[in-house]
Amino acid sequence: MLLVIANAPKDPLARTQGAHLADLPPADFSRRLAGTLPRVLLSAVAVDRVGALVDGFQSLGFAAFSCDPTAAPSDEDRLLVRNIEVEAGAMALLDGQGNHHPCIGASLSLIQRGVRVTTTSETVTTTERRLDVGRAVMTGGLMVTSKAKKQSIETEETREAFLLLQRNDGQPDAVIYERRIDYRFLGADKQPASHANLERTLARLRALAPNAPVDDRVARPGFVTGLPLTSSDPVDLGLYLVTLARTRGL
């Protein structure tokens, strides 16, 4: 289990007591809580111990909760949106097969912004011809070459922004990736750049669901990279932590 801090008091005494409760040096305690909250203070906490730790931190004025990282939803649990249809204030999300999934504005409880980074590695083999001096001497000065194979690993990093539409009507959450959706539904507002189109899509969603807050913590620098390694994808874990914090009004 993870022990998560969603808000921390500024009182130095409370923070000193919090470091003692977590059995951490004060400097390490402060470092783990630096940056955008919520932050994971402790990982791999025993199930029978995490509840007492949450209670202890709450008594010191911290907003704390526990989290099972294996419960974090992934894209396998979400609707991947390929197109959107809007008519008379009603919206339908279309999947890759063209199936319509009705979605009224009131059913959106939260819109999260994020960036998913995908790294791909490929082994590249090249063949070079080199002058074989030894064989050239043996053949009386004839130019003799030999083949040498060289392997290198080429790594490519791809960043793609997305919008996570979280629903409160029992239907699966939906995710809109910047470069995986057909933006023709924007009509005259469609722009040449995908990033600009994603921003216009967000603007339309906010107009349809004015009561749904927009949270960009997962997209902020250092938020996802500051999470501990778990069995869940770091971006999915970050989205889940923000969701849990939001349900607590944080």
Give the residues covered by each predicted segment.
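Phosphoinositide-dependent membrane-docking surfaces
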Residues: 89-94, 99-120
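Anionic N-terminal interaction surfaces
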Residues: 43-85
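Short, surface-exposed beta-strand/loop "edge" segments at domain boundaries and coil↔beta transitions
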Residues: 10-13, 48-51, 97-103, 169-177
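Extended, charged low-complexity segments
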Residues: 139, 144-250
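Mixed-charge, low-complexity intrinsically disordered segments
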Residues: 117-153
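Solvent-exposed beta-strand motifs enriched in subsets of small alpha/beta binding domains
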Residues: 2-8, 36-46
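Surface-exposed, interaction-prone regions with an acidic/low-complexity signature
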Residues: 1-8, 59-65
